[in-house]
Every structure is written in structure tokens, then in C-alpha cells.
Amino acid sequence: EFKPEISAILNLTPDHMDRHKTMECYGAAKANVFRNQDPDQYCVMNYDDKTCFALAENCRAKVVPFSRKEELDFGAFVKDGRIVIKDENGDVTDICGADELQIPGMHNLENALAACAMAYFGGIDHEVIAETLRSFRGVEHRIELCNEIDGIRFVNDSKGTNPDAAIK
């Protein structure tokens, strides 16, 4: 029985529709990640993606929202250009500047917020989280700069699997 201490759902956009057929089926499949979690465990969810965040209604784990757009009462978010975590007691921990991330794109800021929340609520020291975010340069085939010629950037994003990924 799969039962993670910390789970996450980053978004819910049309992808893998050949397998799932409908968005409802796809959402249900993603929600399986937290199906067996207990109230003392965590599920990190994208507050800005309302379709995704609606899945939280059926989650027994503590839902930890993240947002790149709004300051939250609890969770990971950007405040004054800084990635911060606000815990259950309302204490705010500054992690690092959003501009210190080495990977481009708003979706990567969202990924960083989710990773930050998972690490923080998993007990990782905030300085370790900050250094990891500052030093992570991405993965092969994902917005990978191959060359720049006469001001034109050539980017390998062959791991992108849907239009939403290409747009972001």
C-alpha cells in the first residue's frame, strides 16, 4: 500500500489523455498519490491551479498549498521577490530570492515552491533548501539552452509532453 509521508500534485492540465480519456479520470489518477495518507502526513498542492487545488477536498493529509501569485496564511509562496514558508504557527522562514533560481520560467518557480515545501515539512534545514535551489541547473532535455547565435536562443525542451508545458 503506497503511503508517502509527503506527496505533491503540481498541476492538473490535459496530459496523458490517451491513457486517462477525461480530465476527471486524470484528476482521480493524480489523487491516488494521497489516497492512503494519514492526517499527520503532508500533501503539497498548487493553490494557483484551482482545478488541481480542488482535489484537496478529498485529502486526509495536511494540505500544504504553494503559490507564486498570492501570499498565503500557510504554505510556500513568494513575498517581495523572496521564496518563503509560513508554518502552522504562522512563523515565516525566508528561503532565498526567486531571482536566485538557475532555471527559467514561471512553471519552474512553481516547481521550486513545491520542492521547497516538501523539503521544509520533511524536516530539511532551510539553509540546505536554499543552497539546493540556488545550485540546481535543471535536467537534460528540459528547457536546456543548446546554443545562442546572433541573439537567437536554441532550446531543447524535448521532454515537454503537452501544449501547456510548451507555453509555460
Residue locations for each model-derived region?
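Acidic, Mg2+-coordinating active-site environments of NTP-dependent enzymes
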Residues: 3-153
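Glycine-rich phosphate/pyrophosphate-binding beta-alpha loops
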Residues: 138-141, 156-167
